[in-house]
Amino acid sequence: MSQRGLEALLRPKSIAVIGASMKPQRAGYLMMRNLLAGGFNGPVMPVTPAWKAVLGVLAWPTIESLPFTPDLAVLCTNARRNLELLEALGQKGCKTCIILSSQPEQYPALLECAARYQMRLLGPNSLGLLAPWQGLNASFSPVPIHRGKLAFISQSAAVSNTILDWAQQREMGFSYFIALGDSLDIDVYDLLDFLARDSKTSAILLYLEHLSDARRFVSAARSASRNKPILVIKSGRSPAAQKLLHANSGMDPAWDAAIQRAGLLRVQDTHELFSAVETLSHMRPLRGEKLMIVSNGAAPAALALDELWLRNGKLAALSEETRDALRQALPVGVEIANPLDLRDDASSEHYQRAVNVLLNSQDYDALLVIHSPSAAAPGTESALALIDALKHHPRGKYVTVLTNWCGEFSSQEARRLFSDAGLPTYRTPEGTITAFMHMVEYRRNQKQLRETPVLPDSLTANTSEAHALLQQAIDDGATTLDTHEVSPVLRAYGIHTLPTWIAADSAEAVHIAEQIGYPVALKLRSPDIPHKSEVQGVMLYLRTAAEVQQAADAMIDRVKLAWPQARIHGLLVQSMANRAGAQELRVVVEHDPVFGPLIMLGEGGVEWRAEDQAAVALPPLNMNLARYLVIQAIKNKKIRGRSALRPLDIAGLSQLLVQVSNLIVDCPEIQRLDIHPLLASGNEFTALDVTLGLAPFSGDSESRLAIRPYPHQLEEWVVMKNGDRCLFRPILPEDEPQLLAFIAQVTKEDLYYRYFSEINEFTHDDLANMTQIDYDREMAFVAVRTSAEKSEILGVTRAISDPDNIDAEFAVLVRSDLKGLGLGRRLLEKLIAYTQSHGLQRLNGITMPNNRGMIGLARKLGFTVDIQLEDGIVSLSLPLNQG
């Protein structure tokens, strides 16, 4: 999250090129040439003892001899001198440096040196960066790029060069083009925080191969994606590709889960990547998902329809009003439908008429115009007609329009015209639909993230009991627990298991079966055989003592022959569950090396591969997120939506997944959990067979999670002056209805003091932003009073920290009819304690001069109060920790 030094890197006022040269093949020559050719409006200072001047610019022999401290330095010398030069730059006071090449053995010393001088590093082994709005080309790339609104961040120099070459041909612009290299210091999450606030950037494209800190990435990406679309292409999906890239980037389904959870969109290949660049550069935001297609041929429209159907897209339905208008505007033989086929003899005038009618319609959310090469309607004329229609129609600049001019040579000029006009253009109908669905999926992801979670039925969570059971098992030397041993842990979290008994041998198994009644299931108990069915270690529907005796003896004999080294700890005996009409599922928790615990849902089997047979999500889960996981599993055919007799209880399964998530979040000792099978019968879910892997854990239990969970430890009961008890706790996404009810009981005057303007209505998006917070970046405490009838919010206080965790902006609001009870002071004191404990240096706020209550409270709590009557504000500031 740190933004220290990024301003100097991405908006430098002066640059020093260390190792500048007049030899054309040297890096120092290429860097100087590109910096000067880019039109950088600031001093560029070559540093070299070998030349008096480089490319006409006076050179300086050493870093120490520079006339002033550069904002940015670029190391172009032999990598062996990196540490020596970095030390000199640090002593000079330089705050940012691009390292073009280095060896891994230098990395610790380089990082230590940079940290000592509070210097930020881009690279090593970085291609450099381009910032066209600053006229900055601090890279090896000789390709000039245009100014634009798209930022591109890449972990690959080869991919960077490819995109640059492709963009130059299409005259496509960028706000920033940054090659990270090995990301020794500055990483993708730092840049996401910067670009999220950059006014020149409206969309972001990422090429990633690995992550050093998944939690910081998810946090930064989620924050940035609330305001700007972010697309990701991730290589290294296969083990072979990861080996080639020398990167252990984790399981590919984990990336999908993280990207979706952060509200981003993933593209799968370079073809989609190029389409995505075109889309992000030109397409307007979607207001919905319904697509209208206009074409001069049935075949290309059919190809577009097929792709739309395969990707679960939506076709717009035309109203009678629109149909009548089209009939009047177009020749008699044109069938009025969607797609609208203007026929192969359609002229440019027909295109213009059709588009003008459709621009008056509200029936669709995006318009796709397709043109196939035709003698009757040359591509360039039709393109000009479309551009003219959009230019002169009042709604032309507000409608999302995509163009597909088929062909290559005959359509080149048309595509150039569209690019100049700021319209996205594609070469094939399928590619156009792919691009459209990218934006649809992005919109869906954002919409899902903002939905208000439903409150589940009462959730069971006896964390202390679960911890005690797991710790006892660890103290006993256990690394794996079976169904019998893990059942009390699962029951502590409301997860039902089938009663299970342990039998030492076949005779005891028969005795247990006689006691519990037939039929029974018999299972092998061995920590060395994870999949019992591989050795026929599971026998079902045993109905007599003889069958139990025979099955038990045969099972043990088979294992001794097939797995002579395997430890046998007896047998498990269970009553047979009623499987009639039931569905067998599998829930697995695995630990990913990058993203930590993953929750997987599938139908299972012996050869179970999560990549192919499971839907995956990151904990923590609420009811909405769990429901998305279930629906995703059904949609992608990982599980069936119903059994032979009844539909799957999605709400019930979602609640079970939330319980599993809570267990994993609360108990870091759990390394792996495999519930297989999980029997789903109506609204009942029963774990029939469970394996749990565990290991001792010390340190911060949340550090292993890619997303910070709800901080239960911050809950606190408080007694108000009137004697009422209320709970101070962090805000939850589920609080949205209560927050809206709370705001309704705050007077307009108090709301004006809080928001500095009159607000007639808070939208769902407003409330979602207030309740669905990232606990790593901000904190909001609510005071909640609960009675037998209802639970209500009485007050809210909030602090949002800057990315460097130095300053935080605070606000506090109490229900207007509850003033005088000390609630505002207690809430603000809790917020002060929280921000101080998290290392923040200052807590800042603003209010109005006539808000005497807030000003008085701030003074009592030690805030500095600065009344600025001319501006009509009062600045409040409280020092927390020394910098």
Task: Please tell me what each predicted stretch does.
Residues 691-693, 878:
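Short, basic/aromatic-enriched C-terminal tail that caps enzymatic domains
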